[in-house]
Amino acid sequence: MELATRYQIPKEVADIFNAPSDDEEFVGFRDDVPMETLSSEESCDSFDSLESGKQQDVRFHSKYFTEELRRIFIEDTDSETEDFAGFTQSDLNGKTNPEVMVVESDLSDDGKASLVSEEEEDEEEDKATPRRSRSRRSSIGLRVAFQFPTKKLANKPDKNSSSEQLFSSARLQNEKKTILERKKDCRQVIQREDSTSESEDDSRDESQESSDALLKRTMNIKENKAMLAQLLAELNSMPDFFPVRTPTSASRKKTVRRAFSEGQITRRMNPTRSARPPEKFALENFTVSAAKFAEEFYSFRRRKTIGGKCREYRRRHRISSFRPVEDITEEDLENVAITVRDKIYDKVLGNTCHQCRQKTIDTKTVCRNQGCCGVRGQFCGPCLRNRYGEDVRSALLDPDWVCPPCRGICNCSYCRKRDGRCATGILIHLAKFYGYDNVKEYLESLQKELVEDN
């Protein structure tokens, strides 16, 4: 409910408004025209017309103009240096002013908050200004509050203009804020409803698709079963084209093989291989002495006739491999390897053993036969002892020592393959098991047994 009351301004208040100010003269308000609609230029023109006409009946249009406000304008301050201490608690609560209470009740909470914030801003500005300006403002009274702005400040609103402008602007701001908040709430509600509806639609579509897929699957299964039944019926109706075999073998059960036999478990033997020795393993085809065999063998190698003429055998590395007994030193004898661990392998500086074909730097035997050459007469300590039962040191110090290949008793893989026999492999452990010291004696015993059996 708006208050539309008009009060006739007394002469004292009119004198206050008609008194000249610092910058320009204030001649009063124009009758029946609100101050909000007047600009700075129009207000000046209206004041000139009022001054020329000397209108005494000046009316102040404000619904908030009360007796207390009129008394404040009439009373004069005691001194120019006195400051305004503010309103009392009763004035703020509105107990003595029922009209102000009505206006405050019309305002909403947002309007009251805006008014309080504006009052705080005014207090901060007053604190920021120096004391002289404040004393001057208090000495003039409230006449400065109703001064019209100049042409430069025409667009800027005056904070101390009137209470009507203050309340109207506060109401407009509050209405705008409430409208914006309502719009935002409506948009949020609409968005939530749209999202929920979309999610519900998606879930419905997914459930419908899944149900459709299940229905199609069941229909396909039924159709396939019906088709298979029809095909089987057609096949059964035509036995001439597709004869049905009687399951004779299905009735017979296969005999289950047992993993272990009930009798005594026999030792598992390795399968026969081509590398294993034949039946006549160590049997020699001749029964001559070793010396005669060696003589015949070397004479055969030296006799390579071409047109009835003999050709001498070319000797290779004869000078480098032959060492007389006088050249053997104590260092050479100490360098002889007794076991396999004493052998040091060296592919650059080492020399090769005829039996094991390993290139080591230990001292090896030297064959004193004039027809022996190269690696043929070189045997290391372990090979000469295990395979033939001889010692390398005694062989080096013997000027008449001849290597096993020259004697025709070599049992290495190359020599046995050349003679048409298979390789023996590692037989030293088997020979020691049967009570022999070397492989040569074990092979000779086998040969004697075979000869005796024949």
UniProtKB/Swiss-Prot annotation:
Chain span(s) of sequence motif Integrase domain-binding motif 2 (IBM2): 65-91
PTM comment: Phosphorylation increases its interaction with PSIP1.
Location in the cell: Cytoplasm; Nucleus
MYC-binding: annotated segments: 213-235
Effect of T77D: Phosphomimetic mutant. Increased interaction with PSIP1
GO biological process, one term: positive regulation of cell population proliferation
Induction text: By MYC overexpression in a concentration dependent manner in neuroblastoma cell line.
Reported effect, F17A: Significant loss of interaction with PSIP1. Complete loss of interaction with PSIP1
Region (Disordered): 103-169, 188-213
Placement of sequence motif Integrase domain-binding motif 1 (IBM1): 9-33
Residue(s) carrying Phosphothreonine: T77, T81, T88
GO cellular component: cytosol; fibrillar center; nucleolus; nucleoplasm; nucleus
Tissue spec. comment: Ubiquitous. Overexpressed in medulloblastoma.
Effect of substituting S21D: Phosphomimetic mutant. Increased interaction with PSIP1
Note: Cells lacking CDCA7L display a reduction of 25-30% of colony formation in medulloblastoma cell lines. CDCA7L overexpression induces colony formation.
Subunit structure: Interacts with MYC. Interacts (via IBM motifs) with PSIP1 (via IBD domain); phosphorylation increases its affinity for PSIP1.
Annotated function: Plays a role in transcriptional regulation as a repressor that inhibits monoamine oxidase A (MAOA) activity and gene expression by binding to the promoter. Plays an important oncogenic role in mediating the full transforming effect of MYC in medulloblastoma cells. Involved in apoptotic signaling pathways; May act downstream of P38-kinase and BCL-2, but upstream of CASP3/caspase-3 as well as CCND1/cyclin D1 and E2F1.
Protein name from the UniProt record: Cell division cycle-associated 7-like protein
Organism from which the protein derives: Homo sapiens
